[in-house]
Amino acid sequence: MIVSLNGYVLNDPTNPNSLYLDEPIDGLGLPPVRTSSGNYSGRDGGYVGSQFYGMRLITLTGFFFSSSPAALETSRRALAAAIATSSVTLNITTNGGNQYLINCNIDSLDMPILRAINKAPFKITLIATDPIIYDNSSSGSMSVTVTPARGGGITWPITWPITWAAGSQPTTVNNTGNATIYPTITLTDKMTNPTITNQTTGQFFTLTGLTTTAGDVLKIDMKNRTVLLNGGSVLPFMTSTSSWWPLLPGNNSINLTTNDGTDTTVATVSWRSGYRGI
């Protein structure tokens, strides 16, 4: 397994860093589950409430190896500099060739100094506030274009020969991972009261009273729960019955509607597939 922290490579024999991981590597299985539970009063048993994933704690341990004390100290400083920022991007390439991405924050870096002059241990602890392990392969980051739904049929008054217009169908979005993912949806150009629906979950997101013109860009971030029109928040237009909906694992049917037949908007649904564990 090859690991990189903000681009600083560990456990790669072809890399001059000469940092190697020890086992075990903790924190890459199922994330901690937050559970609300209790015992029934006056009878047997108990109950379990809603369960959600908590933050993921990842621990990497290993050794520096070097040909000289000076080179060893250089490696120690380089590792500390690589993860000194609050945000750490953890990239993993497994022995099976799969590539993953985890967004982390640094919790601690311990590098005790030993008597040995050519090697030193290290222990890195990372906190992933987002517990999803994302697919970092070339097919992991995906996007699909969704056009507004239009009904089929004929236009009155009838002209001959009669032309029957085809109706549009929902767009299929395939989340190839095994974790529920919250997408980012970008709508452009003219739209009136847009509604974008995940028919698979039965949830929708509507902005009532919102009208845009050609060149406008509306960005809905389902994960971070923001709605920006040309960079400014338009969250007050969100209806009280709307939901910040996710993409379930597998196929999801996505539908876009607006209130004006002359609207020209299209939506781009973007996401990165993810997993509950490696």
List PLM regions with ranges.
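Intrinsically disordered, low-complexity segments enriched in serine, threonine, and glycine
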Residues: 139-278
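Short, acidic/charged, Gly/Pro-enriched secondary-structure junctions
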Residues: 4, 63-109
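Oligomerization/assembly interface segments of phage tail-like spikes and tubes
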Residues: 45-70, 118-132, 252
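Solvent-exposed loop and beta-edge segments used for protein-protein assembly and interaction
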Residues: 52-56, 82-84, 116-120, 177-179, ...
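Beta-strand elements of well-folded, non-transmembrane domains
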Residues: 64-66, 108-110, 128-132, 189, ...
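Charged, amphipathic alpha-helical segments and their flanking helix caps
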Residues: 74-88, 136-151
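Solvent-exposed edge beta-strands and adjacent loop segments
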Residues: 1-55, 103-111
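Short beta-strand and beta-hairpin "edge-sheet" elements
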Residues: 89-136
